[in-house]
Amino acid sequence: MSQNTPNPVDFCNVSSLLSNDERALQQRMATFVNEKIIPIAASSFDDGVFPREIITDLAKEGVFDCTGLNNVAYGLICQELERGDTGIRTFVSVQNSLVTQPIAEFGSDAQRKTWLPKLASGDAIGCFALTEEQGGSDLANMQTKAVKEGTDWVITGKKVWITNGSIADIAVVWAMTEDGCRAFLVEKNANGFMTSDIENKYSLRASVTSNLTFDGVRVSEEMMLPNMQGLAGPLKCLTNARYGIAWGAIGAAIACFEEVLTHTQKRILFGQPLAATQSIQMRLAEMSRNITTAQLLVLHLGRMKDAGTLHHAQVSIAKWNNVRMALDISRDARDMLGAVGVSSDHCTIRHMLNLETVVTYEGTETVHKLVVGRELTGLNAF
C-alpha cells in the first residue's frame, strides 16, 4: 500500500489524531485480540459459553485496571475487544464501568481497599444489578426494596438480564430505600441471593446473562455505597458504559467490513469479482463513510470526556449513532456475503446477532433519541 493510499478501515487516517501512546496501545490490543479472542470467538458463540480462561489474559493486558489511561485509550480498548467479540467486550465494560467505577467513586475507603485490587486483577468478577422486568428504561419504577433493620439492610426484589450475574463474586445492587435509590454490595454466597442463567439466547452467546433474586438478603451497613443517593448514581455509571459501547460498536463494524471487502474482491461471479460492480462498490463506500463518521465522533467525545466537558446526551447520540451504524453494516455485509454469510465460519453473522443486543441494552435506541430530543427542546417526552 503506497503512502497516499487510504487504509480501508481508517479511510481518513483518524489514527493520525491519536498520540503515540494511544496508537501503541491500540496496536497492542489489536495483536491481543487477533491472538487470543478471535481464535475462540466463534466456538464460544456456537457453544453458548463464556470463555472464563480469557479473564487471566485480559487482566495481564491491564484492561481491568485502566489507571493512568485517558478516555480515548479506554475507548480504543473497547473498539479492539469488540472487533473480536461483543460478549467479551461486554464483560470488560461491566467489570470496569458498572462495577469498578461505582465502587471507586461512590464507595468507602474500606470497600475500595477490599474490592478494587481484586477486580483489577480479575480475581473477582462483578455484576451491575439494575434492570427489572417491569421496565428496564423506567428506573424510577424500581421495585427492589432495601429496608433498614437495626444496623442491617434487608433487600427484596428481582433483577433481570444481568451480565455476569451467575459468575459474579460481587453484585452492585440498586434498590429503593425510604430515602431513595441506593447501591449495595452483595456477595455471591449471601443467604437469600439466587441466580439463574437465561438460556437459548440467539445473541451475546459468549456472555453470561442472568436473572437475580433477592429474598430477604441481609447486608450490613458497611455494604452500602455511602457516597451516592438517588438515580443520578446509576445513570452516571450507564453514561460511562455507553461511552465504551459507542467505541466498541466501531470494532464490530470494522470486522464485518473487512470480511465483506475481502469476500467481494475474491468472489468471482459472471466472470468478474463482485467488487468490480457499481452496486457493491457503492455499498462498500457507504460503509467506509459511516465508519469514518463514527470514528471521528467518539474521538472528539473522548477528548471532551478527558477535558471534563462531556454531556451525557452527547454520549447518547454517540451510542445511538454508532450502534445503529454497526448494525446496519453487519446486516448489509451479511447480505453481500450471500449463503456463507449465515455460517459461523464467517464473523459477520455473529456480530450482527450480537449487535441486536447492543442496540437494546444500556438504553434502547428510542430512549437515546428521546434523551437528545429533551436536550434540543427542553421538554421531557418520557
Indicate where each model-derived feature is located.
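A short, Trp-centered hydrophobic/proline-enriched beta-strand micro-motif
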Residues: G122-L130
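Helix-loop "lid/cap" segments that line or gate small-molecule binding pockets
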Residues: S97-E105
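Short glycine/proline-enriched turns and hinge-like loops at secondary-structure junctions
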Residues: L69, D138-A140, N164-A168, R205-S207, ...
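Short Gly/Pro-enriched turn/cap motifs at secondary-structure boundaries
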Residues: Q134-S137, W161-N164, M176, K201-V208
